[in-house]
Amino acid sequence: AKRQEKENAMAGTLYLCATPIGNLEDITFRVLRTLKEADLIAAEDTRHSIKLLNHFEIKTPMTSYHEYNKVEKAAYLVSQMAQGLNVALITDAGTPGISDPGEELVRQCYEAGIEVTSLPGPAACITALTMSGLSTRRFCFEAFLPSEKGDKKERARILEELKRETRTIIVYEAPHHLVKTLKDLYQALGNRRITVCRELTKKHETAFRTTFEQALS
């Protein structure tokens, strides 16, 4: 496929760089080269990402780009790329834009005629899906359901929608909310087959293949 043409021939490029979700050996040669050659790395949490960069002896300057500054910081990063700088975007783990910051920056880049390219690599949702033993032909990704404290009505609305969903559903959840979410999904979906994945790519990685009833018993 032909790459999109830059509206501004002098502009830099935004590189969406997937980083390991647990195992440092999963980073690609292409991502490492891009992180070293970029003019600036935009990181979800610079304190977290500095460990990754130090491990691979990457000295590229970093700036923060996260959920709480994504609009104004995206405008700043676009202005830097418009002047010819190349920016690499990373998150704490996985692929930028997949249940992580990135969407707003990509949108502003397209609006400004800045080239965007994605460097494939780790993504927890796809890793979990492929090892789940469930159908991979058709699936939907819900990321984290809204919390009951944050938006109870929106959570209920999504669960109601999922009652009609026949595809494999991928959901993220924190360990301390897992039982509650399993109960809510059980009520919405009935006693389906499920796979609960944890510690993906790490030493204690597990995939628990079961049903809702068995998981909650």
Model-predicted segments: where are they?
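Glycine-rich, flexible N-terminal cofactor/catalytic loop recognition
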Residues: 3-68
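A contiguous loop/helix-start segment that scaffolds small-molecule binding in enzyme catalytic cores
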Residues: 6, 11, 167-168, 172-217
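Loop/turn-to-beta-strand initiation segments
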Residues: 12-14, 85-88, 168
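Short glycine-rich anion-binding loops that position phosphate/pyrophosphate groups of nucleotides
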Residues: 21-24, 92-96, 175-177, 202
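Short active-site oxyanion
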Residues: 35-41, 113-117, 168-169
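Conserved helicase motor
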Residues: 65-71, 145-148
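Glycine/small-residue-rich loop that forms an oxyanion/phosphate-binding "nest" at active or ligand-binding sites
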Residues: 74-123
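Class I SAM-dependent methyltransferase SAM-binding "motif I" and its flanking Rossmann-like core
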Residues: 104-165
